[in-house]
Amino acid sequence: MTDYTKDMLYYSENKGLGSEKFNYKFSPIKERKRILYGVCGEGVGHAIRSGVVIKHLLEKNDVTTFAHGRAYHYLRKKFNNVYQIEGFNTVYESNKVNSTKTLLNGIKDLPQDLMNNLTAMYDIAKTFAPHIIISDFEFYSNLLSKILRVPLISLDHTHVVTHCENKVPIKYLKDKLKAEGVVRSFIQLPTIYLITSFFYPPLTNPERVKIFPPILRKEIFELKPENEEHILVYQTSDSNLKLIELLKEFDYNFIIYGFYKEEIDGNLSFRNFNEVGFFDVLASSKAVITNGGFNVISEAIYLNKPIFSMPVKKQFEQILNAIHLEKLGYGEFHDDPDKADLEKFLLNLDIYKKNIQSNFVHDGNHAILQELDVLIEELTTKSSQINTVNKAKIT
């Protein structure tokens, strides 16, 4: 457990949020297990992945979800028992993470968010009595698992940063070390790490870490890829104005998401995000231009779309995705692309497409969802046995 988390737990205990103060008691395990799910709200990738998992879990379990930001708004439209909390947000400027502003904003909001979130989450958890907590890189559900002593499952892509062996160019070493520190401070000592990824570096601790293909939506599986003349552009933030000027130099039609507007500017068509519309554009696109976000890259790869990746600077997870994307031959990675870079990419689309078709394999989410079902059964059975033994000792 990191010093940061110890401080947070100490703070919660001294503010009356300890497990003894809460008088938390576990209910006997019934046929349907009760799962509390925490979802990070940075971008929509965490929400999209969690949406698939939650839908699966609800077939045999009861699920209560806590999420912030865009994840909350996405999930509340799809499920009941979704509650809003506050969370950490990254500040972007000119397609670059502003680490100073991100840190200062987080420090400023943390004391109030800590109190409000843990109080609200515990009030609901006291009634719901979860047997297991699952976190898709959500900080407060991680803390709650420690306070309540409920088994924690980490399920995300983010831990590929800390729990896989990643060799990167020296110029990204500082970003790597910083990212590792942040990731380790968010989630501590879960029972197991389930990592989703389109690349498979060696695991640092195979006994507690398992890696699976990306979790994809049913709608993606149902799409029929075509090869029309437009190129899809998706941006994590609307700060990359340099890219917009670059695209104007080409004869292609670019359909652009991430700038929060509906507008046509020459060969550029800006669109607000709409799931159905996005699916259609993605499936029929010639290629995809994006940052290094895991979800869009994974969906594009599944649909055999070559990818031109410009990861947000200082965002190491995106940088790592882009490095492996290029290494696998699925597309190209550029920090600061110019016209020649994009021209080269467009000339080699057939090569990248063949590489994807030859090498990428997906199992329809079967392995990871099956693993999750087994884990839930094992952990709840073990928890029930421990509670029975403890009760016998008391009597």
Please describe what each predicted stretch is.
Residues I132-D136, S154, D280-L320:
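A donor-sugar binding/catalytic signature common to diverse glycosyltransferases
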Residues V296-I297, I301-K353:
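Catalytic binding pocket for nucleotide-activated donors in carbohydrate/polymer assembly enzymes
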Residues S99-I132, F139-Y140:
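Conserved nucleotide-sugar donor-binding subdomain of glycosyltransferases
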